[in-house]
Amino acid sequence: MARICHGFGMTVLAYDQYRNPALDGIVRYVELDELLRTADLISLHCPLTAETHHIINADTIKMIRDNAILVNTSRGGLIDTNALIDALRARKFAGVGLDVYEDEDGQVFEDFSDDVLQNEVVPILMSFPNVVVTSHQAFFTRTALQSIAITTMENARAFARGEKLVNEVKG
């Protein structure tokens, strides 16, 4: 995502506990509050841990500049859904894209076309004209799926050998 945005001439700000040397010259690392205050587009790309749970909440939403775009393709629990809905009702965001959402268990990978949705959040989110909700489709490209398979096998092999896991999520 950073490379794509950089390719379009965007200034790419990043907040991360661990700097990625592969992104040197592409992103400028800043503190979270600076990113929230200055970014026109905020795209979440992090695991769900105790530290990142509700990283976007009522307080952080207040820091986000008006008419920003918020995208979450990582984990639903990164965003406090009730705070997001309140912000959408207040017309805080120009747009929101959600490939994941809080409490989505049992709602994705199944066809509920002929059923009544039990999760009330999805219809509320979809009622906003500036919100797009997809069901874990953002990452389904041939290249991405191949990368997932290779990474999974490499991690399984390293685990079986007692080696350090390169993709271990700490936290």
Regions found by a protein language model. Name each.
Residues 67, 77-171:
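Rossmann-like dinucleotide-binding domain for NAD(H)/NADP(H)
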Residues 74:
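Conserved catalytic cysteine-centered active-site region
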Residues 1-66:
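Rossmann-like dinucleotide/phosphate-binding beta-alpha-beta segment
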Residues 71:
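Glycine-rich nucleotide-phosphate-binding loops and adjacent flexible coil segments
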